[in-house]
Amino acid sequence: YSNYLINLNIMDFNISNFIDIRSKKSKIGDFQDLDHVDGVALSTVSANLYKEKRDDLVLFYFRDGASYASVFTQSKIISENLKWNKKIKSKKIYGLLINTRNANALTGADGYKALKQISKDLSKMLSNKQNDDEESPKEIKPNEILFGCTGTIGEKFPLTQIKSSIPNLIDRLKYTQNKLIWMKAAMGIKTTDLKPKLSMCEAKIGS
């Protein structure tokens, strides 16, 4: 079996992203080809987290579950999504939700509670998708969802905007990827970067 390691460090895709003077030199042809990865679906939407409309919310959905490993900062001051992720003990995850514009850091109990609410909504909707798409559907639990948050520190976490965008994220999930879709996901998590950053590595594990 082949495992894929994909590094996405960016976030925002509308055609205007490529017209923006700061990133006008970025061309999709400049990036390596990125292959389809079985078992992965992804989608991006605008949750209106920025004044200028852009993709700012990305969902990775692992229909069969994904084994994962985490490396966390050693700092004692961490964001609420890291507190959530460190408590996840499931062997597999089924969803990874990433937002930009807000780091969910120094947001206190409200920031953590927001993730708890989102995980309940997202796990329920992904369970419904399992029922629609799979022969042997699984009930996905809130503790099988991980969060990535990046952006401004100390601002109230935009719970309402993100929750209201989840149905659209689910509807837009695509099981087949190509370079454009990976680019869109990378641009959906971009904060201060001027260009999207994408890379892929394939490795064989075991005999």
Give residue spans per PLM region.
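Short, Lys/Arg-enriched N-terminal segments with co-localized hydrophobic residues
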Residues: 1-10
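N-terminal amphipathic/basic leader segments beginning at the initiator methionine
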Residues: 11-72
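N-terminal glycine-rich anion-binding loops that anchor highly charged ligand groups
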Residues: 51-55, 88-95
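Structural motif
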Residues: 56-59, 81, 94-98, 143-146
